[in-house]
Amino acid sequence: MKEVPMILEICVDDVAGLEAAVRGGADRIELCAALSGGGVTPSAGFMQRAATYGLPVSVMIRPRAGDFVFTHDEADVMKRDIDAARAAGLSGVVLGASRGDGSLDMALLEDLRRHADGMDATLHRAFDVAPDMEEALEAAISLGFPRILTSGGARSALEGVKTLARLSELAKGRIVIMPGAGVRPQSVQALLDSFPITEIHASCSAVPLYDPESRVAKLGFTGAGRKATDEAAVRELKTILSAHHKGGATL
């Protein structure tokens, strides 16, 4: 039986968050913009900056907030963003696309996977809106995704833990089920005790000081939903995962 490394992926949407995640011990970065809206594709400059930290970085490929039903023109933008991630020297992309009924858009995802050939790829939480998650799991496997980021179709991974455990059982090692959404140091042990986990996703974010009376806020430039990566929370989460791994997690 070989040991399985426990990978902590931290999603960030600004340079300060990127640096906090690195200092806190993240193993991989999910690079986004506008996490308050669920995360969209970051700028080329942010991609280039992220490439200098020496960690694997996966870029969110999502041209806008809202649903995951994308037009032909939006798909073209997504391909160009994949090109930008590759040009920046980043290791992976985070993809997802739905049909009108919530099922995975197999044609578009296959096209995007082909366009990202040679890069690591994560299927994001578009998976969570699928009406049949077991069917979506098999679809993700057939598309060749190494992992799925999922909350088990719930608002948080902890709320969806039973579904996550079932998905992990059905996956049978064919694809990684990476829990995400609301993962905090205070709640992660309940996930770890529920099913075998080798990768976990978190933002470890906290709401920064926000003055609604400031001139910047009154002019509409500062959003109350903006959050900041908490380096201490990243470090605490990493410590818990490392202790769990040393406790005998094997494959």
Swiss-Prot record:
Principal localization?
cytoplasm
* Keywords, comma-separated and alphabetical: Cytoplasm
The keyword Cytoplasm appears for this protein = yes
> Where is this protein found?
Cytoplasm
Q: What's an example of a GO molecular-function annotation for this chain?
A: copper ion binding
The protein's matches in SUPFAM superfamilies, at most eight in alphabetical order, are given as: CutC-like
UniProt keyword annotation of Magnesium present:
no
Q: Which Pfam families match?
A: CutC (PF03932)
Bilayer-spanning residue ranges? none
PANTHER family tied to this protein: COPPER HOMEOSTASIS PROTEIN CUTC, COPPER HOMEOSTASIS PROTEIN CUTC HOMOLOG
Checking HAMAP family in the record gives:
CutC
Q: Which family does it belong to?
A: Belongs to the CutC family.
Report what the protein is called: PF03932 family protein CutC
Q: Which organism is it from?
A: Agrobacterium fabrum (strain C58 / ATCC 33970)
